[in-house]
């Protein structure tokens, strides 16, 4: 098979498990916590590194912001051998008791985005793989980390999340909002692959604190610290999968 047109990888270039942050800068941050790493390819928003952690080989690939670019990453990585996708990103809290720096493991994602709907009807569930979900939760518990576990929402319009929308999501007891998980979950399910997601809270929309970091350099200090903790949880989950 020829190199994929956007990720510029082919069969044999990547491993079966991939961590997929949004921010290309976070690829290096994840790689720095691994035992060794090697740059595989870099094009547009996609930076791909192979690494190993505690004896397990993995690939790290940024997806950029939003579901369209995340879908390209999942599509092309799955064509060259990736079977498990773990999103490690940031989110905005939708419940008043959640603070900046809290971590969320998603049990499902409401489809307030357009990409997954090009693949299937909105009625089809966007849910993580059971093993990916339980290993993320288990890795957090093994490290005595406090996390929120529950449903989230994936949305396309970062700057158009109105008070009405936020109130509706809050009333539905959705925990947080981000921009990629619904499509990652839906595509993985359709392909018979595994996917999970853990996100660090970088703002609270109910409290009026707009989530506002496009990169790790812009995150509040507490969120920066907990992004690293979320990365470690994800890496430990990788070794169990």
Curated annotation (Swiss-Prot):
GO terms for biological process: nucleoside catabolic process. It comes from the Archaea. The keyword Ubl conjugation does not apply. Gene3D superfamilies: Nucleoside phosphorylase domain. GO terms for molecular function: guanosine phosphorylase activity; S-methyl-5-thioadenosine phosphorylase activity. Keywords: Glycosyltransferase, Transferase. Activity is higher at low KCl concentrations. Optimum pH is 7.5. Pfam families: PNP_UDP_1 (PF01048). It is an enzyme of class 2 (transferase). Optimum temperature is 30 degrees Celsius. CDD domains: UP_EcUdp-like. InterPro entries: Nucleoside_phosphorylase_CS (IPR018016), Nucleoside_phosphorylase_d (IPR000845), Nucleoside_phosphorylase_sf (IPR035994). One of its GO terms (cellular component) is cytosol. Its EC number is 2.4.2.1. It catalyses: guanosine + phosphate = alpha-D-ribose 1-phosphate + guanine; a purine D-ribonucleoside + phosphate = a purine nucleobase + alpha-D-ribose 1-phosphate; inosine + phosphate = alpha-D-ribose 1-phosphate + hypoxanthine; adenosine + phosphate = alpha-D-ribose 1-phosphate + adenine. Phosphorylase involved in the non-carboxylating pentose bisphosphate pathway, a nucleoside degradation pathway present in some halophilic archaea. Catalyzes the phosphorolytic cleavage of guanosine to guanine and ribose-1-phosphate (R1P). Exhibits the highest activity toward guanosine, but also shows lower activity against inosine and adenosine. Belongs to the PNP/UDP phosphorylase family. This is Guanosine phosphorylase. It comes from Halorubrum lacusprofundi (strain ATCC 49239 / DSM 5036 / JCM 8891 / ACAM 34).
